[in-house]
């Protein structure tokens, strides 16, 4: 019975995330900031970058849900739950910014979510240390990616920049929390594969 309840809960969460029905526990850091004037090309570029970030948060929801579901220790399950709440903030913030820019979330969100959930399930089955190691490396790569977006976003796009900067701060904390809980270092080939997969996702999500 518990397994069925958990399955229903996960399915409900997936539907909410895919359809953008999410809630923020903290105010959007970009809300209310004055936006500078942007050309249509700059708006499209900013929207593409924020769509990539939104997809990253869709994946984060799936990863953390799966990793927390199949983690072995209660302490680690709770850590994933706490981080997932902050990641849901990011999802809500990026979706709001996309609407402000007159754009939309990725049409492939069901695919992104499903793929990430499978990856998270596999990582969790490898044991808590490797499960946390996957988080640590993911957050390290995401931090690097967000730093790149701060360089690429239009200088006058104050709202997007505020959102991305707070996301970056949160991802650093999530990675450190995973290491504090005993994350194992991921092998170099695995890191390379993760980076390659992220490259495919960011390239496609920028456009679709």
Curated annotation (Swiss-Prot):
Localization in the cell: Cell membrane
Pfam families recorded: COQ7
HAMAP family per record: COQ7 (MF_01658)
Record field: catalytic activity: a 5-methoxy-2-methyl-3-(all-trans-polyprenyl)benzene-1,4-diol + AH2 + O2 = a 3-demethylubiquinol + A + H2O
Example of a GO biological process term: ubiquinone biosynthetic process
Known pathway: Cofactor biosynthesis; ubiquinone biosynthesis
The entry's keywords: Cell membrane, Iron, Membrane, Metal-binding, Monooxygenase, Oxidoreductase, Ubiquinone biosynthesis
GO molecular function annotation: 3-demethoxyubiquinol 3-hydroxylase activity; metal ion binding
Cofactor(s) this protein requires: Fe cation
Biological source species: Herbaspirillum seropedicae
EC class of the enzyme, as a word: oxidoreductase
PANTHER family noted in UniProt: 5-DEMETHOXYUBIQUINONE HYDROXYLASE, MITOCHONDRIAL, COENZYME Q10 BIOSYNTHESIS PROTEIN 7
Cofactor annotation comment: Binds 2 iron ions per subunit.
EC code: 1.14.99.60
Domain of life: Bacteria
Entry-linked NCBIfam families: DMQ_monoox_COQ7 (NF033656)
Membrane protein topology class: Peripheral membrane protein
Binding residue positions for Fe cation 2: 87, 139, 171, 174
Protein name stated in the entry: 3-demethoxyubiquinol 3-hydroxylase
Biological role: Catalyzes the hydroxylation of 2-nonaprenyl-3-methyl-6-methoxy-1,4-benzoquinol during ubiquinone biosynthesis.
Gene Ontology cellular component terms for the protein in this record: plasma membrane
Residues where Fe cation 1 binds: 57, 87, 90, 171
Family as reported in the entry's similarity comment: Belongs to the COQ7 family.
